[in-house]
Amino acid sequence: IFMPQWVEGKIAENIHWTDNLFTLKIDADIDKFAAGQFTSVALDIDGVRIARPYSFLNSPDQRPLEFFFYTAIEGKLSNALVKLKVGDSVWIKKQANGFFVLNEIPPCKDIWMLGTGTGIAPYLSILNTPAVWERFEKIVLIQAVRTRADLRYQEVIANLENQFEDQFFFQAFVSRENIEGTFHGRI
C-alpha cells in the first residue's frame, strides 16, 4: 500500500514576534508523534520542494501543530514561510522523527533542558506532557537568546512555574542586553 510521505497543511495562524522570529500554527493530518520529535516542513519554490526539519512546539495531544522559526538571512524556506497567510498551504511530512524524547533519557532524578533561540521548541513540547512531571523531581529550563525581544513563550513558562513551583525552575540568558532577572551572557 502506498503511503504518502507529505501531507498538505493549512496555516491556521502566523505570529510575527520580531523581524526574525515567527510561529506558524498549522492544521495537518499527520501520524502520532512523541514530544521532542521533529518533522519536515516544506514549500514548493520555483518548482522545487524545499524542506527543512523543525521540532514540534506543541505536545502530541495539542492541535494545531506549532513550530517556532528564525528567518535565516539566506534562507529560502524560512523567508517564504514567514510570508504565509491564514489558509495558505504548506507541506508537512506525515511521520515524525527523532530520539530527543523522554524514553531515551536514562534514569535520573533531575533534568536540565538547555535551548538557544527557537531551540526551546522541543522542550515546550515535552513540558506540555504529564510524563515529564511524573518522572523527574526537578526540571530546569534554560533559554539563551540575544535580546529581550527574543524571549518568547514567557507566558507558557510562567504558567509552568505557577503550576509546578517546587519542581520547575526557569532561567533566561540574554547576550546582547542587560535585562533584570536574566543572566547576561551565553550558554
Residue locations for each model-derived region?
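Ser/Thr-glycine-rich phosphate-binding loops at phosphate-binding pockets of nucleotides
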Residues: 116-121
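Conserved S-adenosyl-L-methionine
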Residues: 108, 132-139
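Short, Lys/Arg- and Gly-enriched loop/turn segments at beta-strand edges
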Residues: 47-54, 97-105
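A structural signal for isolated positions on well-ordered beta-strands in alpha/beta enzyme cores
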Residues: 66, 91, 112, 140-142, ...
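Reductase modules of NAD(P)H-dependent flavoproteins
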Residues: 1-7, 142, 147-187
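Acidic/glycine-rich phosphate/pyrophosphate-binding loops and surrounding catalytic core
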Residues: 91, 107-110, 124
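Ferredoxin-reductase
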Residues: 2-88, 175-176
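Histidine-anchored nucleotide/phosphate-binding helix
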Residues: 122-132
